[in-house]
Protein backbone atom coordinates (compact mmCIF):
# COMPACT_ATOMS: atom_id res chain seq x y z
CA UNK A 1 0.00 0.00 0.00
CA UNK A 2 1.12 3.53 -0.69
CA UNK A 3 1.55 5.96 2.17
CA UNK A 4 -1.60 7.78 1.08
CA UNK A 5 -3.60 4.53 1.12
CA UNK A 6 -2.29 3.71 4.59
CA UNK A 7 -3.21 7.18 5.82
CA UNK A 8 -6.73 6.85 4.39
CA UNK A 9 -7.20 3.47 6.07
CA UNK A 10 -6.06 4.85 9.41
CA UNK A 11 -8.40 7.83 9.11
CA UNK A 12 -11.22 5.33 8.75
CA UNK A 13 -10.06 3.69 11.99
CA UNK A 14 -10.12 7.09 13.69
CA UNK A 15 -13.77 7.43 12.72
CA UNK A 16 -14.55 3.90 13.90
CA UNK A 17 -12.99 4.64 17.28
CA UNK A 18 -15.08 7.78 17.62
CA UNK A 19 -18.22 5.81 16.76
CA UNK A 20 -17.33 3.40 19.57
CA UNK A 21 -17.19 6.34 21.95
CA UNK A 22 -13.39 6.28 22.18
CA UNK A 23 -11.41 9.50 21.87
CA UNK A 24 -8.38 8.50 19.73
CA UNK A 25 -6.45 11.50 21.09
CA UNK A 26 -6.57 11.20 24.89
CA UNK A 27 -5.87 13.93 27.43
CA UNK A 28 -3.49 12.20 29.86
CA UNK A 29 -2.26 8.90 31.25
CA UNK A 30 -0.84 7.99 34.64
CA UNK A 31 2.11 5.60 34.42
CA UNK A 32 3.66 3.77 37.35
CA UNK A 33 6.78 2.58 35.54
CA UNK A 34 8.95 2.93 32.45
CA UNK A 35 10.12 0.01 30.33
CA UNK A 36 13.72 0.13 31.55
CA UNK A 37 12.59 0.12 35.20
CA UNK A 38 10.56 -3.03 34.65
CA UNK A 39 13.36 -4.74 32.71
CA UNK A 40 15.79 -4.00 35.55
CA UNK A 41 13.43 -4.71 38.44
CA UNK A 42 12.35 -8.09 37.10
CA UNK A 43 15.56 -9.18 35.40
CA UNK A 44 15.72 -12.33 37.56
CA UNK A 45 12.11 -13.41 36.98
CA UNK A 46 12.07 -16.99 35.72
CA UNK A 47 10.40 -18.09 32.49
CA UNK A 48 6.71 -18.80 33.02
CA UNK A 49 6.66 -16.91 36.32
CA UNK A 50 4.17 -14.11 37.01
CA UNK A 51 4.26 -11.35 39.65
CA UNK A 52 0.98 -10.12 41.08
CA UNK A 53 2.01 -6.46 40.92
CA UNK A 54 -0.17 -4.19 38.83
CA UNK A 55 1.71 -1.72 36.67
CA UNK A 56 0.68 1.00 34.25
CA UNK A 57 2.88 1.93 31.30
CA UNK A 58 2.55 3.88 28.07
CA UNK A 59 4.47 4.10 24.84
CA UNK A 60 4.47 3.63 21.10
CA UNK A 61 3.61 0.33 19.44
CA UNK A 62 6.71 -0.61 17.45
CA UNK A 63 5.65 -4.10 16.33
CA UNK A 64 2.50 -6.23 16.37
CA UNK A 65 2.08 -10.00 16.18
CA UNK A 66 -1.60 -10.91 16.15
CA UNK A 67 -3.02 -14.43 16.37
CA UNK A 68 -6.50 -15.77 17.14
CA UNK A 69 -6.94 -15.18 20.85
CA UNK A 70 -3.45 -13.87 21.52
CA UNK A 71 -1.43 -10.87 20.45
CA UNK A 72 2.07 -9.65 21.25
CA UNK A 73 3.00 -5.97 20.88
CA UNK A 74 6.39 -4.36 21.36
CA UNK A 75 5.89 -1.13 23.31
CA UNK A 76 8.60 1.55 23.29
CA UNK A 77 8.86 4.46 25.70
CA UNK A 78 11.70 6.91 26.27
CA UNK A 79 13.74 4.39 28.23
CA UNK A 80 13.44 1.26 26.10
CA UNK A 81 11.04 -1.49 25.05
CA UNK A 82 8.92 -4.15 26.68
CA UNK A 83 6.56 -6.78 25.31
CA UNK A 84 2.81 -6.61 25.85
CA UNK A 85 1.18 -10.02 26.33
CA UNK A 86 -2.43 -9.65 25.17
CA UNK A 87 -4.85 -12.48 25.98
CA UNK A 88 -8.42 -12.17 24.70
CA UNK A 89 -10.14 -13.77 27.70
CA UNK A 90 -8.21 -11.69 30.22
CA UNK A 91 -8.85 -8.41 28.37
CA UNK A 92 -12.53 -9.15 27.75
CA UNK A 93 -13.05 -9.97 31.41
CA UNK A 94 -11.27 -6.85 32.65
CA UNK A 95 -12.83 -4.46 30.13
CA UNK A 96 -16.36 -5.91 29.91
CA UNK A 97 -17.91 -2.74 31.32
CA UNK A 98 -15.95 -0.52 28.92
CA UNK A 99 -16.02 -2.37 25.61
CA UNK A 100 -17.66 -5.76 25.12
CA UNK A 101 -15.41 -6.50 22.14
CA UNK A 102 -12.24 -4.83 23.43
CA UNK A 103 -9.77 -7.47 22.23
CA UNK A 104 -10.99 -7.50 18.63
CA UNK A 105 -11.06 -3.71 18.54
CA UNK A 106 -7.46 -3.73 19.76
CA UNK A 107 -6.51 -6.10 16.94
CA UNK A 108 -8.45 -4.30 14.23
CA UNK A 109 -8.06 -0.62 15.13
CA UNK A 110 -4.45 -0.32 16.28
CA UNK A 111 -1.31 -0.11 14.15
CA UNK A 112 2.41 0.14 14.63
CA UNK A 113 3.07 3.75 15.51
CA UNK A 114 0.02 4.20 17.74
CA UNK A 115 0.56 5.32 21.33
CA UNK A 116 -0.99 2.97 23.84
CA UNK A 117 -1.48 2.94 27.60
CA UNK A 118 -1.86 -0.42 29.35
CA UNK A 119 -2.42 -1.80 32.84
CA UNK A 120 -1.54 -5.30 33.88
CA UNK A 121 0.81 -7.54 35.81
CA UNK A 122 4.36 -8.68 35.08
CA UNK A 123 4.98 -12.06 33.47
CA UNK A 124 7.94 -13.71 31.80
CA UNK A 125 6.72 -15.89 28.94
CA UNK A 126 7.77 -19.49 28.44
CA UNK A 127 10.10 -18.21 25.72
CA UNK A 128 11.79 -15.94 28.25
CA UNK A 129 10.39 -12.55 27.21
CA UNK A 130 9.55 -10.18 30.07
CA UNK A 131 6.05 -8.87 29.41
CA UNK A 132 3.25 -6.78 30.77
CA UNK A 133 0.34 -9.24 31.00
CA UNK A 134 -2.33 -6.76 29.95
CA UNK A 135 -5.69 -6.40 31.67
CA UNK A 136 -6.80 -3.07 30.23
CA UNK A 137 -5.62 -0.80 27.44
CA UNK A 138 -6.35 2.74 26.25
CA UNK A 139 -5.55 4.10 22.81
CA UNK A 140 -3.87 7.40 23.66
CA UNK A 141 -2.94 8.57 20.16
CA UNK A 142 -3.90 7.10 16.80
CA UNK A 143 -1.09 7.60 14.29
CA UNK A 144 -1.94 8.30 10.65
CA UNK A 145 1.42 7.77 8.97
CA UNK A 146 3.37 4.48 8.95
CA UNK A 147 6.76 4.09 10.58
CA UNK A 148 9.70 3.24 8.28
CA UNK A 149 10.04 -0.40 7.31
CA UNK A 150 11.33 -2.28 10.35
CA UNK A 151 14.00 -4.11 8.35
CA UNK A 152 15.45 -1.14 6.51
CA UNK A 153 14.69 1.58 9.04
CA UNK A 154 15.19 5.24 8.26
CA UNK A 155 18.39 5.10 6.21
CA UNK A 156 18.04 8.20 4.01
CA UNK A 157 20.44 10.55 5.80
CA UNK A 158 18.77 13.75 4.60
CA UNK A 159 15.37 12.43 5.64
CA UNK A 160 16.73 11.52 9.07
CA UNK A 161 17.74 15.13 9.64
CA UNK A 162 14.63 16.57 8.01
CA UNK A 163 12.24 14.34 9.96
CA UNK A 164 14.21 14.05 13.17
CA UNK A 165 11.04 13.06 15.04
CA UNK A 166 10.88 9.84 12.97
CA UNK A 167 14.62 9.32 13.37
CA UNK A 168 14.21 9.50 17.15
CA UNK A 169 11.34 7.01 17.10
CA UNK A 170 13.13 4.31 15.12
CA UNK A 171 16.77 4.83 16.13
CA UNK A 172 17.32 4.53 19.92
CA UNK A 173 21.01 5.45 19.53
CA UNK A 174 19.97 8.88 18.25
CA UNK A 175 17.95 9.47 21.41
CA UNK A 176 21.02 8.47 23.40
CA UNK A 177 23.12 11.07 21.57
CA UNK A 178 20.79 13.86 22.66
CA UNK A 179 20.60 12.54 26.21
CA UNK A 180 24.38 12.71 26.32
CA UNK A 181 24.34 16.20 24.87
CA UNK A 182 22.07 17.29 27.72
CA UNK A 183 24.36 15.58 30.25
CA UNK A 184 27.41 17.30 28.74
CA UNK A 185 25.95 20.81 28.89
CA UNK A 186 24.60 20.22 32.40
CA UNK A 187 28.01 18.93 33.47
CA UNK A 188 29.81 21.97 32.07
CA UNK A 189 27.45 24.34 33.87
CA UNK A 190 27.81 22.39 37.10
CA UNK A 191 31.62 22.41 36.88
CA UNK A 192 31.74 26.18 36.41
CA UNK A 193 29.07 26.99 39.00
CA UNK A 194 30.96 24.91 41.58
CA UNK A 195 33.91 27.24 40.95
CA UNK A 196 31.83 30.40 41.44
CA UNK A 197 31.33 31.26 37.77
CA UNK A 198 28.06 33.07 37.08
CA UNK A 199 26.06 32.49 33.88
CA UNK A 200 24.66 35.76 32.50
CA UNK A 201 22.65 36.00 29.28
CA UNK A 202 23.77 38.55 26.70
CA UNK A 203 21.89 39.93 23.67
CA UNK A 204 21.28 37.80 20.60
CA UNK A 205 20.25 40.89 18.60
CA UNK A 206 23.16 43.33 18.44
CA UNK A 207 23.78 46.68 16.81
CA UNK A 208 27.39 45.67 16.06
CA UNK A 209 28.49 42.15 15.14
CA UNK A 210 31.79 41.59 16.91
CA UNK A 211 33.91 39.14 18.85
CA UNK A 212 34.89 36.99 15.87
CA UNK A 213 35.81 37.13 12.20
CA UNK A 214 32.55 35.89 10.70
CA UNK A 215 29.77 37.00 8.39
CA UNK A 216 26.63 37.82 10.39
CA UNK A 217 22.95 37.37 9.69
CA UNK A 218 21.30 40.77 9.28
CA UNK A 219 17.77 41.69 10.28
CA UNK A 220 15.75 44.88 10.70
CA UNK A 221 13.85 46.25 13.68
CA UNK A 222 10.76 47.96 12.33
CA UNK A 223 9.90 50.12 15.33
CA UNK A 224 13.43 51.36 15.95
CA UNK A 225 14.10 51.53 12.21
CA UNK A 226 17.58 50.10 12.61
CA UNK A 227 19.65 47.27 11.23
CA UNK A 228 20.52 44.56 13.71
CA UNK A 229 22.76 41.49 13.63
CA UNK A 230 22.37 38.05 15.13
CA UNK A 231 25.36 37.60 17.40
CA UNK A 232 28.46 35.91 16.03
CA UNK A 233 29.98 35.63 19.51
CA UNK A 234 29.14 36.46 23.13
CA UNK A 235 32.61 37.84 23.82
CA UNK A 236 32.20 41.60 23.85
CA UNK A 237 29.19 41.69 26.15
CA UNK A 238 30.74 39.23 28.59
CA UNK A 239 33.83 41.45 28.72
CA UNK A 240 31.60 44.42 29.53
CA UNK A 241 30.45 42.41 32.56
CA UNK A 242 34.08 41.94 33.64
CA UNK A 243 34.54 45.72 33.37
CA UNK A 244 31.42 46.12 35.50
CA UNK A 245 32.90 44.15 38.38
CA UNK A 246 31.97 40.51 37.83
CA UNK A 247 35.10 38.38 38.12
CA UNK A 248 33.91 35.01 36.75
CA UNK A 249 31.22 34.92 34.07
CA UNK A 250 30.12 32.58 31.29
CA UNK A 251 27.34 32.02 28.81
CA UNK A 252 26.38 28.79 27.08
CA UNK A 253 24.21 29.67 24.13
CA UNK A 254 23.49 29.89 20.43
CA UNK A 255 25.73 31.65 17.92
CA UNK A 256 24.75 32.52 14.33
CA UNK A 257 27.12 32.86 11.38
CA UNK A 258 26.00 33.35 7.79
CA UNK A 259 28.56 30.94 6.39
CA UNK A 260 28.92 27.54 4.77
CA UNK A 261 27.48 24.21 5.89
CA UNK A 262 29.63 21.10 6.28
CA UNK A 263 30.06 18.10 8.56
CA UNK A 264 31.74 20.50 11.04
CA UNK A 265 29.79 23.72 10.45
CA UNK A 266 26.16 24.71 10.93
CA UNK A 267 25.03 28.36 10.63
CA UNK A 268 23.38 28.07 14.06
CA UNK A 269 25.56 26.41 16.67
CA UNK A 270 26.31 26.39 20.39
CA UNK A 271 29.34 27.63 22.27
CA UNK A 272 30.32 28.38 25.80
CA UNK A 273 32.45 31.45 26.48
CA UNK A 274 34.08 31.90 29.87
CA UNK A 275 35.87 34.97 31.25
CA UNK A 276 37.87 35.17 34.47
CA UNK A 277 39.38 38.35 35.87
CA UNK A 278 43.01 38.28 37.06
CA UNK A 279 43.71 35.17 34.96
CA UNK A 280 45.61 34.54 31.72
CA UNK A 281 45.65 31.92 28.98
CA UNK A 282 47.66 29.52 31.15
CA UNK A 283 44.82 29.49 33.67
CA UNK A 284 42.38 28.93 30.80
CA UNK A 285 44.33 25.85 29.67
CA UNK A 286 43.93 24.34 33.12
CA UNK A 287 40.22 25.27 33.12
CA UNK A 288 39.71 23.71 29.68
CA UNK A 289 41.35 20.45 30.75
CA UNK A 290 39.23 20.41 33.87
CA UNK A 291 35.93 21.02 32.08
CA UNK A 292 36.40 18.43 29.34
CA UNK A 293 37.96 15.66 31.42
CA UNK A 294 35.39 16.04 34.20
CA UNK A 295 32.46 15.94 31.79
CA UNK A 296 33.91 13.00 29.84
CA UNK A 297 34.40 11.03 33.05
CA UNK A 298 30.87 11.85 34.27
CA UNK A 299 29.13 11.03 30.98
CA UNK A 300 31.25 8.14 29.66
CA UNK A 301 32.93 6.85 32.80
CA UNK A 302 36.37 6.91 31.14
CA UNK A 303 38.99 9.20 29.59
CA UNK A 304 39.99 6.53 27.07
CA UNK A 305 37.58 7.03 24.18
CA UNK A 306 37.33 6.16 20.50
CA UNK A 307 36.35 8.60 17.78
CA UNK A 308 35.55 7.16 14.35
CA UNK A 309 37.90 4.26 15.03
CA UNK A 310 40.71 6.46 16.39
CA UNK A 311 41.70 5.90 20.06
CA UNK A 312 41.84 9.17 22.01
CA UNK A 313 43.42 9.60 25.44
CA UNK A 314 41.91 12.56 27.32
CA UNK A 315 44.07 12.03 30.39
CA UNK A 316 45.72 15.33 31.42
CA UNK A 317 48.10 17.04 31.14
CA UNK A 318 47.66 17.65 27.43
CA UNK A 319 50.47 18.57 25.10
CA UNK A 320 51.28 22.30 24.84
CA UNK A 321 53.26 23.41 21.80
CA UNK A 322 53.68 26.65 19.85
CA UNK A 323 52.32 27.12 16.35
CA UNK A 324 55.86 27.89 15.17
CA UNK A 325 57.21 24.61 16.53
CA UNK A 326 54.37 22.56 15.03
CA UNK A 327 54.80 24.09 11.58
CA UNK A 328 58.53 23.39 11.78
CA UNK A 329 57.81 19.81 12.92
CA UNK A 330 55.48 19.03 10.00
CA UNK A 331 56.96 21.15 7.19
CA UNK A 332 60.55 21.86 8.15
CA UNK A 333 59.87 25.61 7.82
CA UNK A 334 61.24 27.86 10.57
CA UNK A 335 59.12 31.01 10.35
CA UNK A 336 61.26 32.68 13.01
CA UNK A 337 64.12 32.75 10.51
CA UNK A 338 62.32 34.61 7.70
CA UNK A 339 63.24 38.27 7.33
CA UNK A 340 60.79 39.20 4.56
CA UNK A 341 57.37 38.11 3.34
CA UNK A 342 58.80 37.18 -0.05
CA UNK A 343 61.36 34.90 1.57
CA UNK A 344 58.59 33.19 3.55
CA UNK A 345 56.40 32.83 0.45
CA UNK A 346 59.17 31.22 -1.57
CA UNK A 347 59.95 28.70 1.16
CA UNK A 348 56.25 27.95 1.66
CA UNK A 349 55.70 27.31 -2.04
CA UNK A 350 58.64 24.93 -2.04
CA UNK A 351 57.01 23.12 0.89
CA UNK A 352 53.84 22.60 -1.17
CA UNK A 353 51.58 24.96 0.77
CA UNK A 354 48.65 26.16 -1.41
CA UNK A 355 47.30 29.72 -1.52
CA UNK A 356 50.60 31.34 -0.60
CA UNK A 357 50.17 34.35 -2.90
CA UNK A 358 47.05 35.50 -1.01
CA UNK A 359 48.91 35.90 2.30
CA UNK A 360 49.54 39.55 3.23
CA UNK A 361 51.96 38.99 6.12
CA UNK A 362 54.36 36.43 7.54
CA UNK A 363 51.95 35.82 10.41
CA UNK A 364 49.08 34.99 8.07
CA UNK A 365 51.36 32.75 6.05
CA UNK A 366 52.37 30.93 9.23
CA UNK A 367 48.71 30.35 10.02
CA UNK A 368 48.08 29.14 6.46
CA UNK A 369 50.92 26.62 6.75
CA UNK A 370 49.48 25.43 10.05
CA UNK A 371 45.98 24.98 8.63
CA UNK A 372 47.17 23.17 5.50
CA UNK A 373 49.90 20.94 6.92
CA UNK A 374 49.41 20.56 10.67
CA UNK A 375 45.78 20.72 11.84
CA UNK A 376 44.62 17.36 10.51
CA UNK A 377 47.50 15.59 12.28
CA UNK A 378 46.61 16.79 15.78
CA UNK A 379 44.62 13.73 16.84
CA UNK A 380 45.40 13.63 20.56
CA UNK A 381 44.42 16.67 22.70
CA UNK A 382 46.88 19.44 21.91
CA UNK A 383 47.05 23.07 23.02
CA UNK A 384 48.49 25.06 20.12
CA UNK A 385 49.82 28.26 21.68
CA UNK A 386 51.18 31.69 20.70
CA UNK A 387 49.45 32.85 17.51
CA UNK A 388 50.33 35.67 15.09
CA UNK A 389 48.86 39.03 16.09
CA UNK A 390 47.36 39.51 12.60
CA UNK A 391 44.73 36.82 13.12
CA UNK A 392 43.96 37.58 16.78
CA UNK A 393 42.60 41.14 17.08
CA UNK A 394 41.21 40.68 20.61
CA UNK A 395 44.19 38.96 22.29
CA UNK A 396 46.89 40.51 24.48
CA UNK A 397 50.39 40.83 22.95
CA UNK A 398 52.74 38.05 24.02
CA UNK A 399 54.75 39.15 27.04
CA UNK A 400 58.05 37.90 25.57
CA UNK A 401 57.54 37.18 21.83
CA UNK A 402 57.02 40.29 19.63
CA UNK A 403 54.52 39.78 16.80
CA UNK A 404 52.65 37.06 18.69
CA UNK A 405 49.73 37.06 21.09
CA UNK A 406 48.90 34.97 24.13
CA UNK A 407 46.37 32.70 22.54
CA UNK A 408 45.76 28.98 22.32
CA UNK A 409 43.46 26.73 20.37
CA UNK A 410 42.66 23.22 21.52
CA UNK A 411 42.74 20.58 18.80
CA UNK A 412 41.35 17.06 19.16
CA UNK A 413 40.90 14.61 16.26
CA UNK A 414 42.26 17.24 13.87
CA UNK A 415 39.66 19.90 14.59
CA UNK A 416 39.53 23.02 16.71
CA UNK A 417 37.49 22.42 19.86
CA UNK A 418 38.45 25.42 22.00
CA UNK A 419 39.95 28.90 21.70
CA UNK A 420 41.42 31.14 24.40
CA UNK A 421 43.25 34.43 24.92
CA UNK A 422 44.94 36.44 27.54
CA UNK A 423 42.42 39.15 26.73
CA UNK A 424 43.47 42.52 25.36
CA UNK A 425 42.79 45.18 28.00
CA UNK A 426 44.64 48.16 26.47
CA UNK A 427 41.88 50.37 24.96
CA UNK A 428 44.28 52.22 22.65
CA UNK A 429 45.75 49.02 21.20
CA UNK A 430 42.24 47.56 20.91
CA UNK A 431 41.00 50.60 18.98
CA UNK A 432 43.89 50.38 16.53
CA UNK A 433 43.21 46.70 15.86
CA UNK A 434 39.46 47.17 15.42
CA UNK A 435 39.99 50.14 13.11
CA UNK A 436 42.30 47.98 10.99
CA UNK A 437 39.51 45.38 10.90
CA UNK A 438 37.01 48.08 9.91
CA UNK A 439 39.23 49.07 6.97
CA UNK A 440 39.15 45.47 5.77
CA UNK A 441 35.37 45.46 6.19
CA UNK A 442 35.04 48.65 4.15
CA UNK A 443 37.21 47.08 1.46
CA UNK A 444 34.73 44.23 1.10
CA UNK A 445 35.82 41.66 3.69
CA UNK A 446 32.44 40.30 4.85
CA UNK A 447 33.98 38.55 7.85
CA UNK A 448 35.94 41.49 9.27
CA UNK A 449 34.71 43.18 12.44
CA UNK A 450 33.58 46.77 12.73
CA UNK A 451 34.42 49.22 15.49
CA UNK A 452 32.18 48.75 18.52
CA UNK A 453 32.49 52.17 20.14
CA UNK A 454 30.57 51.20 23.24
CA UNK A 455 32.91 48.26 23.85
CA UNK A 456 35.91 50.57 23.49
CA UNK A 457 34.30 52.99 25.94
CA UNK A 458 33.93 50.12 28.40
CA UNK A 459 37.62 49.28 28.06
CA UNK A 460 38.53 52.90 28.78
CA UNK A 461 36.89 52.56 32.19
CA UNK A 462 39.43 49.80 32.80
CA UNK A 463 39.22 46.02 32.44
CA UNK A 464 41.34 43.89 34.80
CA UNK A 465 43.73 41.30 33.42
CA UNK A 466 41.41 38.63 32.06
CA UNK A 467 41.58 35.15 30.63
CA UNK A 468 38.90 34.17 28.14
CA UNK A 469 37.88 30.77 26.77
CA UNK A 470 35.47 29.52 24.12
CA UNK A 471 34.54 25.86 23.58
CA UNK A 472 32.46 24.59 20.66
CA UNK A 473 29.73 22.55 22.34
CA UNK A 474 28.64 20.81 19.14
CA UNK A 475 32.17 19.62 18.36
CA UNK A 476 32.68 18.48 21.94
CA UNK A 477 29.43 16.52 21.78
CA UNK A 478 30.53 15.02 18.45
CA UNK A 479 33.73 13.84 20.14
CA UNK A 480 32.03 12.36 23.20
CA UNK A 481 29.25 10.65 21.22
CA UNK A 482 31.47 9.43 18.35
CA UNK A 483 29.36 11.37 15.83
CA UNK A 484 30.82 11.95 12.36
CA UNK A 485 28.77 15.04 11.47
CA UNK A 486 27.66 18.12 13.38
CA UNK A 487 24.16 17.39 12.06
CA UNK A 488 24.14 14.23 14.16
CA UNK A 489 24.36 16.26 17.39
CA UNK A 490 22.00 19.13 16.49
CA UNK A 491 18.40 18.05 16.90
CA UNK A 492 17.11 20.09 13.97
CA UNK A 493 20.02 21.19 11.73
CA UNK A 494 19.48 23.74 8.99
CA UNK A 495 18.74 22.07 5.64
CA UNK A 496 17.91 23.19 2.16
CA UNK A 497 14.15 23.06 1.52
CA UNK A 498 13.32 19.53 0.45
CA UNK A 499 11.82 20.63 -2.87
CA UNK A 500 14.94 22.52 -3.85
CA UNK A 501 16.91 19.30 -4.38
CA UNK A 502 15.00 18.11 -7.47
CA UNK A 503 17.58 16.81 -9.92
CA UNK A 504 15.34 16.05 -12.90
CA UNK A 505 11.82 14.95 -13.79
CA UNK A 506 9.87 13.42 -16.67
CA UNK A 507 6.20 13.06 -17.57
CA UNK A 508 4.31 10.26 -19.29
CA UNK A 509 1.33 11.91 -20.98
CA UNK A 510 -0.62 8.73 -21.64
CA UNK A 511 -0.64 7.49 -18.04
CA UNK A 512 -0.30 10.95 -16.48
CA UNK A 513 2.67 9.74 -14.46
CA UNK A 514 5.23 12.27 -13.20
CA UNK A 515 8.64 10.81 -12.30
CA UNK A 516 10.94 12.94 -10.13
CA UNK A 517 14.56 12.23 -9.23
CA UNK A 518 15.98 14.08 -6.23
CA UNK A 519 19.62 14.95 -5.54
CA UNK A 520 19.63 12.38 -2.75
CA UNK A 521 19.21 9.68 -5.43
CA UNK A 522 15.60 8.92 -4.49
CA UNK A 523 13.18 8.49 -7.40
CA UNK A 524 9.40 8.81 -7.00
CA UNK A 525 6.47 8.30 -9.37
CA UNK A 526 3.33 10.43 -8.90
CA UNK A 527 0.13 9.11 -10.47
CA UNK A 528 -2.81 10.80 -12.24
CA UNK A 529 -1.04 14.13 -12.43
CA UNK A 530 -2.90 16.44 -14.86
CA UNK A 531 -0.84 17.85 -17.77
CA UNK A 532 -1.48 21.36 -16.46
CA UNK A 533 0.36 20.55 -13.23
CA UNK A 534 3.36 19.30 -15.19
CA UNK A 535 3.30 22.43 -17.38
CA UNK A 536 3.22 24.64 -14.30
CA UNK A 537 6.21 22.72 -12.92
CA UNK A 538 8.06 23.30 -16.20
CA UNK A 539 7.51 27.04 -15.93
CA UNK A 540 8.00 27.46 -12.19
CA UNK A 541 10.98 29.70 -11.26
CA UNK A 542 11.61 27.46 -8.22
CA UNK A 543 10.71 23.91 -9.07
CA UNK A 544 11.33 22.77 -5.52
CA UNK A 545 8.94 25.27 -3.99
CA UNK A 546 6.34 24.51 -6.66
CA UNK A 547 6.67 20.79 -5.90
CA UNK A 548 6.18 21.38 -2.18
CA UNK A 549 3.09 23.51 -2.71
CA UNK A 550 1.26 21.85 -5.59
CA UNK A 551 2.44 18.21 -5.88
CA UNK A 552 3.73 16.87 -2.58
CA UNK A 553 0.90 15.21 -0.66
CA UNK A 554 -1.62 15.87 -3.44
CA UNK A 555 -1.17 12.70 -5.51
CA UNK A 556 -0.66 9.01 -4.87
CA UNK A 557 2.96 8.00 -5.32
CA UNK A 558 5.43 5.15 -5.21
CA UNK A 559 9.12 5.28 -4.35
CA UNK A 560 11.19 3.53 -7.03
CA UNK A 561 14.59 3.92 -5.39
Swiss-Prot record:
PROSITE patterns: AA_TRNA_LIGASE_II. It catalyses: tRNA(Lys) + L-lysine + ATP = L-lysyl-tRNA(Lys) + AMP + diphosphate. GO terms for cellular component: cytosol. Binds 3 Mg(2+) ions per subunit. Its EC number is 6.1.1.6. It is an enzyme of class 6 (ligase). The lineage of its organism: Bacteria, Bacillati, Cyanobacteriota, Cyanophyceae, Nostocales. One of its GO terms (biological process) is lysyl-tRNA aminoacylation. It is found in: Cytoplasm. HAMAP family: Lys_tRNA_synth_class2. GO terms for molecular function: ATP binding; lysine-tRNA ligase activity; magnesium ion binding; tRNA binding. Mg(2+) 1 binds at residues 409, 416. Gene3D superfamilies: Bira Bifunctional Protein, Domain 2 (3.30.930.10), Nucleic acid-binding proteins (2.40.50.140). Belongs to the class-II aminoacyl-tRNA synthetase family. Its cofactor is Mg(2+). This is Lysine--tRNA ligase. Mg(2+) 2 binds at residue 416. Keywords: Aminoacyl-tRNA synthetase, ATP-binding, Cytoplasm, Ligase, Magnesium, Metal-binding, Nucleotide-binding, Protein biosynthesis.
